[in-house]
UniProtKB/Swiss-Prot annotation:
Family: Belongs to the UvrC family.
Biological processes annotated in GO: nucleotide-excision repair; SOS response
Origin: domain of life: Bacteria
UniProt GO MF annotations: DNA binding; excinuclease ABC activity
Taxonomic placement: Bacteria, Pseudomonadati, Pseudomonadota, Gammaproteobacteria, Enterobacterales
InterPro entries, per database record: GIY-YIG_endonuc, GIY-YIG_endonuc_sf, GIY-YIG_UvrC_Cho, Hlx-hairpin-Hlx_DNA-bd_motif, RuvA_2-like, UVR_dom, UVR_dom_sf, UvrABC_protein_C
Protein name: UvrABC system protein C
Domain GIY-YIG: 16-94
UniProt domain UVR: residue ranges: 204-239
Compartments where located: Cytoplasm
Free-text function comment from the UniProt entry: The UvrABC repair system catalyzes the recognition and processing of DNA lesions. UvrC both incises the 5' and 3' sides of the lesion. The N-terminal half is responsible for the 3' incision and the C-terminal half is responsible for the 5' incision.
A UniProt-annotated Pfam family: UvrC_RNaseH
Amino acid sequence: MSEIFDAKAFLKTVTSQPGVYRMYDAGGTVIYVGKAKDLKKRLSSYFRSNLASRKTEALVAQIQHIDVTVTHTETEALLLEHNYIKLYQPRYNVLLRDDKSYPFIFLSGDTHPRLAMHRGAKHAKGEYFGPFPNGYAVRETLALLQKIFPVRQCENSVYRNRSRPCLQYQIGRCLGPCVAGLVSEEEYAQQVEYVRLFLSGKDDQVLTQLIARMEKASQDLAFEEAARIRDQIQAVRRVTERQFVSNAGDDLDVIGVAFDAGMACVHVLFIRQGKVLGSRSYFPKVPGGTELGEVVETFVGQFYLQGSQMRTLPGEILLDFNLSDKTLLADSLSELAGRRIHVQTKPRGDRARYLKLARTNAATALITKLSQQSTITQRLTALAAVLKLPAIKRMECFDISHTMGEQTVASCVVFDANGPLRAEYRRYNIAGITPGDDYAAMNQVLRRRYGKAIEESKIPDVILIDGGKGQLAQAKAVFAELDVPWDKHRPLLLGVAKGADRKAGLETLFFEPEGEGFSLPPDSPALHVIQHIRDESHDHAIGGHRKKRAKVKNTSTLETIEGVGPKRRQMLLKYMGGLQGLRNASVEEIAKVPGISQGLAEKIFWSLKH
């Protein structure tokens, strides 16, 4: 039995300076991290007779030890608090379940700059525009820019080794700076400047310069050039007319909040240079009994102050909640950014409309999320009843994909009580079996997955085997032979076979390979969750197989050529910009690749042609 925490003795040792505290349970796990302007005063509040909430009561009941870190300032304490939350993921803290850095558009500092998507640290020389809410928004913008301003987007390894322009040049989406004489340095630099102005929100300057160039071209009787610039002007105008634009200098993050049934949604609207770049909804993990104020305060702190997130701080943050520590947050963000950051909770005019939009989006996203969660919960409850299990907290499903026995890939997808856990999806490359032997493939993937130590929380309640009796027999055989420290009898093995016509709703389920199967009604919620996880597993397996097949397809031709090993294959593909570029190259161009002689270049050329 663990000793009772001696709060009185502990509080006598605590200072009244600012700092951070970490609370531990009997197992030595950090269960809560907090900050305080006055550590003694804040920590004393936990041990009063009348606590503020049940959540605090439950927390205090588990405390076995408290560590304190004193800081110079309250700002230091705030930064340290969020780094500790990130490190320990305490169960009584509100946790932001998002660890992705945001993507930017990168304009390189090369002689002929290129456009690309970028995530992570900004080490490369060049300019960064953003952040954008996701990769899709960046790719859409890059595709749009390519149509209006024909600046290259190819990798430098491709750009440096071209002797003829690529397809992008042929269709007018690149000026072809890789080949001398196709475009002047001045013209390319001008298009790069247009991109820079456009991404900075200075559309009017772009239009003014383009109009002046069009008029000059007309005066010089260069009508084809004037027509090309006219088309560019029209394209820029079409884009700017569709934009939701505020004041040209607006550089804001707008944060709306919705809270219902113990779940919170925080919706962030990203506005840069007056343009809405996009938005994103977050669903932080909220311990029971948490107040909305704590949710918002913790989310904002974690969102901006955790160093690994690579956030770009805007000049102003609009919040849909009046924080108690608003001044402290603004000071901490300003210190982090090296410039003044304003935090507003009661904006007017356009800013108030932005905040209303973020609030509406948060409410809509929360309703959708609650509906989805309710549906998956109902389906899992129904499946647990069918399988005579008390509950299903974790379920895993396996599928095999190949083409005529080649490039075999197995997939494992994971569902928990909230649905798909995509971060835990896995693919396994299958090797050393007879091509096309699905049973051997299933045997191999199950041994690799379960023939090792597994955390208690990650032992599945149900393992679904796609393929019917034969595959289920393999699973039973594997589990019978497993020698592992965890309870291998806990997972229920369930086989699922498609119906005679392979139509959804006609599936047959098996508990035993030699037993009779059973079917569920097509409208059964239990069947729907089985179909959901099976389809996820199928798609995941096919995706992995296609990638593997494409990789083999791109290198298999070269592998048959004598004298071309892995290093030379890699060098050829790198310098020629891929297999297609190599197929189109002449003998002389191939011979310029390091490590390729004239004789070998001729052999490669004729092998690829015939």
